Amino acid sequence: MDTKDLSKVQKDRNVKLEKLRSEGFDYPNDFEKKYDISYLVEKFGNFSKSELENKNQMASNAGRVVLKREMGKVVFITIEDFSGRIQAYFSKNNLEERLEEVKDLDLGDIVCIEGILFRTKTDELTIEVKDFKLLTKSTTCPWVYLGPIKETKRQITPLNLYPSQ
């Protein structure tokens, strides 16, 4: 791949991809999703914090990373599938040395997560991640300049640029 025309962000993403490949990353396809994100939100969205704690509801889902916030020993990531969005909470207590892998995730990557549903201090429905797996590494930025509108009008753009309503 000719890297002279790539942006710094794309170069960094390609370096991360090469690192993954050298570690044996092989685009796993063994994940089986039980429910769509919209199902989890509809079924458990009205549960209170204590009800979710008592229920101890496991959730596993896959989606595209559309938002990431790092806060020291925890990382919050919002993932999106075709049906909606949900927040995922990654903590050093649950993932130990794998938290660095989470910090290497980029917007546009596709991950599968497994964990327990809970509510945050801001009362947002969230999955407390116990295990995760990178399914696809994104090498392009979601905010890449697509060119003049005339030329790109009919092009298909990434879903995370224009999320469905």
Where are these regions (language model features)?
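Class II aminoacyl-tRNA synthetase catalytic cores and aaRS-like
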Residues: M1-Q165
